[in-house]
């Protein structure tokens, strides 16, 4: 656990230092022990070992709001969505986006499990509601893990009964570790945001390593704030931040059955009003936090050794720029070239050419970081040695200009290695 924590802290510190935080944001100082005041006012969090799939580690997590909290959530676009996704989507509507708790298990996705899976997801909400003396529809349920297997409900129920005794408001490590599957390190961060009527805390935890593709993938993100925000505004802010973060990453091009990003606002702190400067400040902080968490997921991509920012500009529209960027980011040939540290620019423009984005190839321009690789007229006059220095770095950018408009989009991707095949070839064994 110490090695995992050290990896997390080193990676988080590096990304946080590289982030240009917006006005009024104070990034959290995270100690070497990982023990610090993490959660916003009005929240308590617990974790326990339900022994669902993993032994010797926590695999169940509970977030509780002391009072009804404004809630917002986004779910997978996969048509084969898991039972907890269906249930949570329904609960969000039934409760008028007022929630008290989020419960999550790892190791079993409760996906492709039919009517019994739906009954089991409901039973999880019912059990949490009974333990906390709240309504079942005030509970969001999330699961992640192997698809197509029923939950061991006796163990799940026992875990839920044990969770309330573990609730606390200081440490993040138990909760974030409990939601991990193939992740190699926990992903979390928090910031304070200075608003006109006081400072609020904004924090998030996430998991994800494989099945990561735009439109969210096998990733879970849980965010909390003590700001007072109406549910409608919270949903708008979360949706916009999600579009620029979790929906802008890819590891392997697969979209999961269980994706969920949920956010709770306890209302114990300063108010954020629609159309105010406070809304702009809070929105900018939320976007930066979620982008950091999204980058952590890409860095931890199964077998990944590189984090690459892919920007397409000069497109007819932002939508076409995103088409090209996604196709490049998901290209196996591009990803293997990234892993091999090969300046194979032809694979990049070939991917753009099949993306559906419109351009004239003679207008294309390409850069690795600030280094020109391809100039207009398909002139590739660059130093392979200088390019190799950039490609050997753990993190760098690829920028492609289509020369056909003002549209742009940025995504984050990683390389594709032999280890990815090894991890996913033995996932169930």
From Swiss-Prot:
<comment type="function">
    <text>Catalyzes two activities which are involved in the cyclic version of arginine biosynthesis: the synthesis of N-acetylglutamate from glutamate and acetyl-CoA as the acetyl donor, and of ornithine by transacetylation between N(2)-acetylornithine and glutamate.</text>
</comment>
<protein>
    <recommendedName>
        <fullName>Arginine biosynthesis bifunctional protein ArgJ</fullName>
        <ecNumber>2.3.1.35</ecNumber>
        <ecNumber>2.3.1.1</ecNumber>
    </recommendedName>
</protein>
<comment type="similarity">
    <text>Belongs to the ArgJ family.</text>
</comment>
<feature type="binding site">
    <location>
        <position position="302"/>
    </location>
    <ligand>
        <name>substrate</name>
    </ligand>
</feature>
<dbReference type="GO" id="GO:0004042">
    <property type="term" value="F:L-glutamate N-acetyltransferase activity"/>
</dbReference>
<feature type="site" description="Involved in the stabilization of negative charge on the oxyanion by the formation of the oxyanion hole">
    <location>
        <position position="144"/>
    </location>
</feature>
<comment type="pathway">
    <text>Amino-acid biosynthesis; L-arginine biosynthesis; N(2)-acetyl-L-ornithine from L-glutamate: step 1/4.</text>
</comment>
<dbReference type="Pfam" id="PF01960">
    <property type="entry name" value="ArgJ"/>
</dbReference>
<dbReference type="GO" id="GO:0004358">
    <property type="term" value="F:glutamate N-acetyltransferase activity"/>
</dbReference>
<keyword id="KW-0028">Amino-acid biosynthesis</keyword>
<feature type="binding site">
    <location>
        <position position="218"/>
    </location>
    <ligand>
        <name>substrate</name>
    </ligand>
</feature>
<dbReference type="GO" id="GO:0006526">
    <property type="term" value="P:L-arginine biosynthetic process"/>
</dbReference>
<feature type="binding site">
    <location>
        <position position="424"/>
    </location>
    <ligand>
        <name>substrate</name>
    </ligand>
</feature>
<keyword id="KW-0068">Autocatalytic cleavage</keyword>
<feature type="binding site">
    <location>
        <position position="429"/>
    </location>
    <ligand>
        <name>substrate</name>
    </ligand>
</feature>
<keyword id="KW-0511">Multifunctional enzyme</keyword>
<dbReference type="InterPro" id="IPR016117">
    <property type="entry name" value="ArgJ-like_dom_sf"/>
</dbReference>
<dbReference type="InterPro" id="IPR042195">
    <property type="entry name" value="ArgJ_beta_C"/>
</dbReference>
<keyword id="KW-0963">Cytoplasm</keyword>
<comment type="subunit">
    <text>Heterotetramer of two alpha and two beta chains.</text>
</comment>
<dbReference type="InterPro" id="IPR002813">
    <property type="entry name" value="Arg_biosynth_ArgJ"/>
</dbReference>
<keyword id="KW-0055">Arginine biosynthesis</keyword>
<feature type="site" description="Cleavage; by autolysis">
    <location>
        <begin position="217"/>
        <end position="218"/>
    </location>
</feature>
<dbReference type="GO" id="GO:0006592">
    <property type="term" value="P:ornithine biosynthetic process"/>
</dbReference>
<feature type="binding site">
    <location>
        <position position="207"/>
    </location>
    <ligand>
        <name>substrate</name>
    </ligand>
</feature>
<feature type="binding site">
    <location>
        <position position="181"/>
    </location>
    <ligand>
        <name>substrate</name>
    </ligand>
</feature>
<keyword id="KW-0808">Transferase</keyword>
<comment type="pathway">
    <text>Amino-acid biosynthesis; L-arginine biosynthesis; L-ornithine and N-acetyl-L-glutamate from L-glutamate and N(2)-acetyl-L-ornithine (cyclic): step 1/1.</text>
</comment>
<keyword id="KW-0012">Acyltransferase</keyword>
<feature type="active site" description="Nucleophile">
    <location>
        <position position="218"/>
    </location>
</feature>
<dbReference type="GO" id="GO:0005737">
    <property type="term" value="C:cytoplasm"/>
</dbReference>
<feature type="site" description="Involved in the stabilization of negative charge on the oxyanion by the formation of the oxyanion hole">
    <location>
        <position position="145"/>
    </location>
</feature>
